[in-house]
Amino acid sequence: MIILGVESSCDETAAAVVEDGSRVLSDVVASQAALHGPYGGVVPELASRKHVEAILPVLGEAMHEAGVTWGQVDAIAATQGPGLVGALLVGLSAAKALAYALKKPMVAVNHLEGHIQAAFLGREELTRPFVCLVVSGGHTALYRVDPDGTTSFLGSTRDDAAGEAFDKVAKLLALGYPGGVEIERLAAGGDPHAFNFPRAFIDGRSLEFSFSGLKTSVATFVRQHGPPSESGEQGAYRLADLLASFQEAVVEVLVNKTVRAAGMCSVGDIAVVGGVAANLRLRERFEEEAGMHRFELHLPARRYCTDNAVMIAAAAYRTWKRSGFCLDPVDLDARSRWF
């Protein structure tokens, strides 16, 4: 079965053609990072306008790269939510139009379920339950996922998502957007134990997250100590040490709570997905914990951590296997909140 997937929930316009939920025939992503960089974050109105410009070229390129005709496509899939509603509408409307015009069945995909599916691309689906950490610029949440696809919410952030905290600290220090990539690069040369930043809800059984206090703590430190230096001369602090310490605080909380959730749910498998799952320090710490606690760790390839349409097409295939497609795409509408 060949599925054309479409993704436009935030600031990437993406399309992909995937066969049988795992064989990637094409994978096209048009990033808007340069557009939003001067603002230090995504501007929703600009994002939706850019999606309008990019959607048809991206769809055409995906079909050309896949080497298939429209007649060979068995179904259309698109992200329905959650995300920026104006951005979602562009990809969803394009997919609905294609499904209607070509008389193809369609499935609407939950963006977070797409991320979860990214951890198992090219692999067999788990036949046992697992705990999944979804961690990105817009989401930081824990779920229990059962073999039949049932997803149970375990806990999420009370304020900022982890990726949002990375972006806000990067903006504070004028590091550019997206901030996570630059912070990771600079933190690699720093001491993660140089500064003891707060870890919210780190003790006890809570599965909730909070990163606003950590972000504020970094801002307060910079305000009190002034700008960093490159080498730390004359008692000044190094930027690399500051960023490494901030990153370590985020990573410790994410790892601690995810492992705790797995223990509370009595499961032996953990998946970590979403844009922040591309962070090498986070992956390293989870791998260390997997070795210590003997759980099976499932990580997407780094290129599939950020938003893409491969995961949407793959998730649609799994949905079809479970319950079939939505045969009337006309009634589908974007959902800014879902789960």
UniProtKB/Swiss-Prot annotation:
Q: What is its EC number?
A: 2.3.1.234
Checking InterPro entries in the record gives: ATPase_NBD, Gcp-like_dom, KAE1/TsaD, Peptidase_M22_CS, TsaD
A Pfam match is TsaD
Major subcellular location class: cytoplasm
**Superkingdom, according to UniProt?**
Bacteria
Compartments (UniProt record): Cytoplasm
Give me the reactions it catalyses: L-threonylcarbamoyladenylate + adenosine(37) in tRNA = N(6)-L-threonylcarbamoyladenosine(37) in tRNA + AMP + H(+)
GO MF, one annotated term: iron ion binding
Q: Give the GO biological process terms.
A: tRNA threonylcarbamoyladenosine modification
Keyword tRNA processing in record: yes
User: Any S-S bridges, and between which cysteines?
Assistant: none
Per the record, GO CC terms? Answer: cytoplasm
Names of required cofactors: Fe(2+)
Q: Which residues bind substrate?
A: V134, V135, S136, G137, G138, D167, G180, N279
| Residues binding Fe cation, per UniProt | H111, H115, D307
Provide the top EC class: transferase
Supply the alphabetized keyword list.
Answer: Acyltransferase, Cytoplasm, Iron, Metal-binding, Transferase, tRNA processing
Free-text comment on the cofactor = Binds 1 Fe(2+) ion per subunit.
Which Gene3D superfamilies is this protein grouped with?
Answer: 3.30.420.40
Family, as annotated: Belongs to the KAE1 / TsaD family.
Record-linked NCBIfam families: gcp_kae1 (TIGR00329), T6A_TsaD_YgjD (TIGR03723)
- What functional role does this protein have? Required for the formation of a threonylcarbamoyl group on adenosine at position 37 (t(6)A37) in tRNAs that read codons beginning with adenine. Is involved in the transfer of the threonylcarbamoyl moiety of threonylcarbamoyl-AMP (TC-AMP) to the N6 group of A37, together with TsaE and TsaB. TsaD likely plays a direct catalytic role in this reaction.
> Would you tell me the protein name for this molecule?
tRNA N6-adenosine threonylcarbamoyltransferase
What is the scientific name of the source organism?
A: Syntrophobacter fumaroxidans (strain DSM 10017 / MPOB)
Recorded name of the encoding gene: tsaD
